[in-house]
């Protein structure tokens, strides 16, 4: 198994600057100051994305058709559903408006956006909607038209392209309306081509994700500074949302997880409504969205500015070691599955050291699946326009002998195994989110082969820890990585709790 580096002290937090300032403070952490202001990002590179997708399709002719999300009412109500743009449409348009569609003519390299027809009543009630002239100014497109032109334009394209021309769509349910008898509708080719493009982020996409992480960092810090005065998980969720919205991020990338005590052992806990009194840790998994790009950040922290006990401090240090050891090894060409193995190896050696594991070698314990009782999910996932973003292949893969150990993923939320063995590539953004959870239901359903390696008397001392997870968003580079996430961990995290309330003595 070998040995793994130990980590001490607080991690170094990089200084970053965009839409505000970030400054180191005397406590060893940093202060982030963001203001709402007009975005200074360049136009979303929709045309470049369309060209990349066409190159993946590898055909000299054809028409790509993508439907945007439509405005809709709630069932039996006159209230609209919360709008969320279709991510494939956004990737090739950069448009976050309802009721739009697009076409891209591969041969002529022409990207056309179709916007909602003018509706005076809607304009009066809801305000101005996107029109063709405004769309041309705002977006990286060649032409903008009203929706009323769409069907006729496609018919004209089909007539000019000849018999057997192809229209590429994502799904059969998202074909353009109308009768196109001489056109072949292909709903198999476009999605994998777009997935292959989306997995490698360009600089514009990366900058959106950097900023989403900046907002999330500010929100996590606000929670730390206020946690001493909070009495319920709901206040944690409310504080995080308040900071994000105040900084212009009105949407979350996923539902906030504010899990205290034993609730932190539930991976996707969502109630966020229990009192904090008597709990050791809070696991806050929450990430803002910026221009449809996700962040995914998890921090676990005590309710006061000191560790609640030896057991809690040991588990936190072990998870931090797991995470930082894996992050340090990230670069192009690394197999992500190897990092997942590494995280389990560190957990096993740590549990042997503190007495939770017994009776067997580290390799025997690993093969029994005992470590998966405490770390039941994958090390991470792709992130981008979706929090669990797309890719042609999973970042997990089979082992070199063509098999995948079943113990690795006995309880994963998303099945990560595929027949291929991909490695990390420059431009990918992945999460690294190891965790250790003391789940009573998992232990109650453990197999005898697992239980023989576990000292349940020792485990009882750790049950109050609940769960610890630490998660950052990592950009893969040619020679290493860039950590997009700067929310404080370790001692720097405790310093922020201390700053929030003088009664929280370290």
Curated annotation (Swiss-Prot):
Domain of life: Eukaryota
GO biological process terms on file: proteolysis
EC annotation from Swiss-Prot or TrEMBL: 3.4.11.9
Stored InterPro entries: Aminopep_P_N, Creatin/AminoP/Spt16_N, Creatinase/aminopeptidase-like, Pept_M24, Peptidase_M24B_aminopep-P_CS, X-Pro_dipept-like
Pfam families named among the record's database cross-references: AMP_N, Peptidase_M24
Keywords assigned: Aminopeptidase, Hydrolase, Manganese, Metal-binding, Metalloprotease, Protease
Cofactor note: Binds 2 manganese ions per subunit.
Cofactor(s) required for function per UniProt: Mn(2+)
GO MF, any single term: manganese ion binding
Enzyme superclass (EC): hydrolase
Catalytic activity line of the entry: Release of any N-terminal amino acid, including proline, that is linked to proline, even from a dipeptide or tripeptide
UniProt cross-references to SUPFAM superfamilies, sorted A to Z: Creatinase/aminopeptidase, Creatinase/prolidase N-terminal domain
Amino acids binding Mn(2+) 2: 285, 296, 471
Binding of Mn(2+) 1, residues: 296, 433, 471
Role according to the record: Catalyzes the removal of a penultimate prolyl residue from the N-termini of peptides.
Protein family per UniProt: Belongs to the peptidase M24B family.
Name listed for the protein in its UniProt record: Probable Xaa-Pro aminopeptidase PADG_06815
Record lineage: Eukaryota, Fungi, Dikarya, Ascomycota, Pezizomycotina
């Amino acid at each position: 198994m070998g040995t793994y580096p130990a980590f001490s002290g607080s991690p170094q937090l990089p200084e970053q600057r965009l839409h505000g300032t970030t400054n180191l403070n005397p406590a060893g952490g940093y202060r982030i100051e963001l203001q709402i202001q007009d975005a200074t990002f360049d136009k979303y590179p929709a045309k470049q994305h369309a060209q990349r997708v066409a190159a993946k399709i590898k055909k000299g002719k054809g028409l790509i058709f993508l439907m945007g999300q439509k405005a809709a009412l709630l069932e039996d109500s006159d209230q609209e559903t919360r709008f969320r743009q279709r991510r494939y449409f956004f990737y090739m348009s950069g448009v976050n408006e309802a009721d739009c569609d697009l076409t891209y003519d591969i041969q002529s390299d022409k990207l056309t956006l179709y916007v909602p027809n003018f509706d005076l009543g809607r304009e009066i009630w809801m305000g101005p909607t996107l029109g063709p002239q405004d769309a041309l100014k705002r977006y990286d497109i060649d032409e903008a038209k009203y929706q009323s032109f769409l069907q006729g334009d496609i018919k004209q394209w089909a007539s000019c392209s000849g018999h057997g021309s192809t229209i590429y769509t994502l799904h059969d349910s998202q074909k353009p309306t109308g009768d196109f008898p001489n056109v072949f509708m292909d709903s198999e080719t476009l999605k994998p081509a777009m997935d292959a493009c989306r997995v490698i982020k360009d600089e514009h996409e990366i900058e959106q994700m950097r900023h989403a992480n900046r907002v999330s960092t500010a929100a996590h810090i606000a929670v730390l500074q206020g946690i001493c005065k909070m009495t319920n998980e709901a206040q944690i969720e409310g504080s995080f949302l308040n900071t994000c919205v105040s900084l212009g991020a009105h949407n979350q990338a996923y539902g906030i997880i504010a899990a205290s005590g034993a609730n932190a052992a539930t991976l996707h806990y969502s109630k966020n409504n229990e009192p904090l009194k008597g709990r050791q840790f809070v696991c806050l998994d929450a990430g803002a969205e910026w221009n449809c790009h996700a962040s995914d950040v998890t921090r676990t922290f005590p309710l006061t500015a000191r560790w609640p006990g030896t057991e809690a401090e040991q588990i936190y240090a072990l998870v931090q070691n797991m995470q930082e050891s894996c992050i340090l090894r990230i670069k192009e060409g690394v197999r992500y599955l190897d990092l997942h193995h590494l995280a389990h190896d560190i957990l096993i050696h740590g549990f042997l050291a503190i007495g939770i594991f017994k009776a067997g070698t580290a390799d025997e314990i690993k093969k029994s699946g005992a470590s998966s009782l405490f770390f039941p999910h994958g090390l991470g996932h792709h992130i981008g326009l979706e929090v669990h973003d797309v890719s042609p292949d999973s970042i997990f893969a089979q082992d070199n002998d063509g098999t995948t150990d079943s113990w690795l993923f006995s309880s994963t939320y998303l099945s990560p195994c595929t027949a291929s063995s991909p490695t990390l590539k420059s431009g990918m953004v992945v999460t690294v989110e190891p965790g250790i959870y003391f789940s009573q239901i998992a232990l109650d359903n453990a197999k005898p082969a697992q239980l023989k390696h576990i000292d349940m008397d020792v485990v009882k001392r750790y049950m109050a820890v609940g769960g610890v997870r630490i998660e950052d968003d990592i950009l893969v580079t040619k020679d290493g990585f860039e950590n997009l996430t700067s929310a404080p961990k370790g001692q720097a995290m405790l310093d922020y709790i201390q700053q929030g309330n003088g009664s929280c003595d370290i």
